[in-house]
Design a protein with these regions (language model features):
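An alpha-beta-alpha
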Residues: 159-220, 243
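Beta-alpha junction/loop-to-helix N-cap segments that form part of ligand/metal-binding clefts
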Residues: 66-73, 84-153, 221-227, 254
């Protein structure tokens, strides 16, 4: 399925890259972009050549650094492999946005001054929403590896996503829990000032109502209150929640797992893609992750040759197993490569 989705995405991107000049004016806002789920039979094909400046934006420092570094490291491996093939060549430069919208726009502008032609990123949702408006106005082609809110691409015909979207994560999680853990009493802890967390929570709750999943507790937090979850955990425990759904990033999740253990509370914890990377967090007690479940589009244990080659290279270079953000960064560069080839672009 992921391979098929990749083919559809590449074909949609070919349409966006067909002019290869990036100077088209934005489409009239009253006219929606073409439906990228149905690739055109007339998509251009050809042989691309030349050197393209590929920029990357993501959190290389700060609370979400595990995501950004993994995505950029994965992208770099793909760049090296593609450059070794001859033909299209990529110059790659990554900028740090600390997962902040304003900083991300500044990082994007730095790359534009460098001469960037195609953007890989931003990595996180809030930053990607901020940058997507600039990308659309500048008519720069962009592909985010992992920013999963539909707001990232809504109304923009030159911004794409590798990852699955927040609505799909919320629906998929609720469906899985209802089918595999019937009778579960669910507590939710989410960040209500973050589009990513709020978006997944909303679709999870909506789907839970449709499939008869019982939600007994909900607790919220903000960017400034993610160091103590005792109130949220106490409420969930007192109401009998035996599963805690966490549509949140790895850093608050680590605090939640640690505090739950400290209060003798041991529900099943179920995270989404933001949970990925928690095992690589400095100082994290990995025993706390025993039994934790998460929704992820990538498994480093997959037996196919290409996955194992990527995992081996990543481990050799960085001394750790790649997470889904690394895989998404890697895939993003190959999707761009295939789109450039199909469109016959010249650098």
């Amino acid at each position: 399925m992921k391979k098929f989705f990749g083919i559809l995405l590449t074909l949609a991107m070919v349409l966006s890259l067909a002019a290869c000049g990036g100077n088209d004016k934005p489409a009239d806002s009253s006219t929606p972009p073409a439906d990228s789920s149905q690739p055109s039979a007339d998509a251009p094909s050809g042989s691309a050549s030349g050197t393209f400046k590929l920029g990357g934006v993501g959190p290389l420092t700060g609370d979400a650094a595990i995501y950004g570094n993994a995505a950029m490291n994965g992208a770099k491996i793909a760049v090296e492999e593609i450059n070794a093939l001859g033909g299209i060549q990529f110059e790659f430069q990554a900028e740090d946005d600390v997962a902040d919208g304003e900083t991300s726009v500044n990082a994007y502008n730095t790359l534009m001054d460098w001469g960037m032609q195609v953007l890989v990123g931003p990595v996180t949702t809030g930053a990607a929403i901020a940058v997507s408006a600039e990308v659309y106005n500048d008519r720069v082609f962009a592909l985010t590896p992992s920013a999963s809110s539909t707001d990232v691409i809504s109304g923009k015909d030159n911004m794409f996503q590798v990852c699955f979207t927040d609505p799909n994560q919320g629906v998929g999680s609720a469906d899985y829990i209802s089918q595999n853990m019937p009778g579960a009493k669910v507590g939710i802890i989410y960040r209500n000032d973050d589009a990513y967390s709020q978006g997944i929570r909303d679709t999870f709750v909506s789907e839970a109502g449709k499939v008869g999943l019982e939600i007994v507790s909900e607790g919220t937090f903000t960017k400034d209150t993610q160091s103590d979850f005792s109130v949220q955990l106490t409420d969930a425990k007192s109401k009998g929640a035996d599963l805690i759904f966490l549509p949140t990033y790895y850093q608050p999740n680590a605090v939640i797992l640690n505090q739950a253990k400290g209060m003798g509370y041991a529900p099943t914890f179920f995270g989404v893609d933001g949970m990925d990377g928690i095992l690589a967090m400095p100082g994290f007690d990995t025993s706390l992750a025993e039994g934790v479940m998460l929704l992820t589009p990538f498994s480093a244990d997959a037996a196919d040759e290409r996955t194992q080659s990527f995992v081996s290279k990543y481990n050799e270079l960085h001394g750790e197993t790649p997470n889904q953000f690394a895989a998404d960064g890697y895939d993003a560069v190959y999707i761009i490569y295939e789109a450039l080839q199909a469109a016959g672009c010249t650098g």
